[in-house]
Amino acid sequence: MTTLIVGGSSGLGLALAKEFADAGDKVIVTGRKKPDADFVKFEKLDLSVSPAPMIAKLVESLPNIDRLVYSAGFYQDGLVTDLSNEQIDQMINVAGTGLIYFMRELLNKQGKLKQLITITSTSQWTPRRLEPIYNFAKAGIGHFSNAMAEDGRVEKVLVVGPSGMRTKFWDGVARDDLDKMLDKAWVAEQVLKSLPGDYKYKFIRILRQPARVEEADIR
């Protein structure tokens, strides 16, 4: 299979790329910086500003994609009144509307997609005072992906809501619980274990203390 991982140049996205490459997939990753990894093909892509034209151009240049993994995220904490227009747009573009444009372009080009894997967060279902825009974006892509499972052109959808992981995502963010966060390689393994099966839609939560996987919905 050919797997495209958006936000795959670091963190969980790169850990997933390693898992899929080891399983024999041809893996293409997007990101802002090229990863030090010889098992992927890298496509530079910055989703933070006006992503639609860049996504259309990229998809047109790619081979047919069997599996889309959307693992892109951008985080800024603060009350809604604390955040600038630019910060709000960046979070929504990267963590939200980028997925919409990728799905539109892939389905327009290919007519179908075998698998969609969407990485959200516990912020998909847990409201947090200092994460209103992040809550909005993660809940939005979770429900959008659920709707994609109702589109007959998409064969299988897996939505994954993990707790925080020890990645560069938290660089520059003051946290006192980094030592309690999940290991990204372990999370990637759980995603691959949850992928097989006869379903159209599955939603799993990957939680910590203790580290575990909960199946929240399946049909």
Residue ranges and their predicted role:
Residues V69, G98-L106, Q110, F144-S145:
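Hydrophobic positions on the long internal alpha-helix
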Residues F74, T81-Y101, I141:
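Catalytic Tyr-X3-Lys loop
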Residues E155, V159-V160, R175-R219:
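C-terminal helical subdomain
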Residues D38-A52:
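Rossmann-fold cofactor-recognition segment
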Residues A23-D38:
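Conserved glycine-rich Rossmann-like NAD(P)H-binding loop of the short-chain dehydrogenase/reductase
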